[in-house]
């Protein structure tokens, strides 16, 4: 509402929510919404999408052949072709489509319930450990199934490397494409370690991760 009153485009980054929560762009009155395919949508890397409300004009970042209106010497202006220069990632899009079919068959509510259960199990297991600082509001009813934390003053990359090399646990360290948030948290230099839970994960795997953090905290 504020953006509309000030004639500002309302742009939503749904990278962490697409496939986790239902999104109604009409109800949210979104002008532009972007999402990646390889996170909650379970699709291949290198896929994603952009919703653009009718009437919103976007200048193409890239121009080139599209296989549409070939004899026109100018880049197509009609949507979505205007934003799809070059050969599309057909096999990636097919994989993303198959993943979305799977989500629809299984139900994102069912998937989200398990992911949040695993997330809370992990949070409960590490949040009270000394020298472990967890970021985020875990009392919120609606949140992504991720846990981001730091261990003492250790660089997040060192913690992530240790988890990978010693315990075989893959995590994401660093700034997570959110530099302004890390400025607000005061973690620009340290970054943070992020666990992202999938409904393919098990409680046993979560417990293994908790034990790993406990052991690293004891070494700290």
Model-derived regions: residue spans:
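Pyridoxal 5′-phosphate
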Residues: 1-220
